């Protein structure tokens, strides 16, 4: 995609309308531009007040394939989100990232061991399942 398209979408991530932010995140994930600016903007959306926006941002990050420690840690944090859909998207995104990075499995396994007594451990197990089953 052209730089102008990416710039326009980045601007829309700050729109006051949640459906606009949501759609812009989805579009950025589909474009596949994993520039630091795009990744940083999507990481910021993981803290959005709207669950559909957090969901789309997590999915987009999983699609971009940037398995940096910052991205992996942010997605692990979403495994404790209050909504199922966001936790599931984070688990799926971690599974996607694990296809290209060997450190994701170890990081998720460590997260599970640290949270084994919490109500969120199942979401960590889902992430690990996505990693192991979809691994190439």
Language-model features: locations:
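Amphipathic alpha-helical scaffolding segments comprising HEAT/armadillo-like alpha-solenoid repeats
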Residues: 1-12, 33-46, 66-79, 100-112, ...
């Amino acid at each position: 995609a052209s730089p102008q398209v990416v710039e326009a979408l980045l601007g829309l991530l700050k729109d006051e309308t949640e459906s606009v932010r949501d759609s812009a995140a989805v579009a950025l994930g589909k474009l596949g531009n994993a520039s630091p600016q795009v990744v940083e903007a999507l990481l910021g959306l993981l803290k959005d007040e709207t669950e559909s926006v957090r969901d789309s941002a997590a999915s987009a990050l999983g699609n971009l394939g940037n398995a940096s420690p910052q991205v992996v840690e942010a997605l692990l944090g979403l495994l404790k989100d209050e909504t199922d859909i966001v936790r599931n998207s984070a688990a799926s995104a971690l599974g996607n990232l694990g296809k290209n990075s060997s450190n994701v499995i170890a990081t998720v396994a460590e997260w599970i061991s640290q949270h084994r007594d919490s109500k969120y451990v199942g979401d960590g197990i889902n992430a690990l399942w996505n990693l192991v089953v979809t691994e190439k």
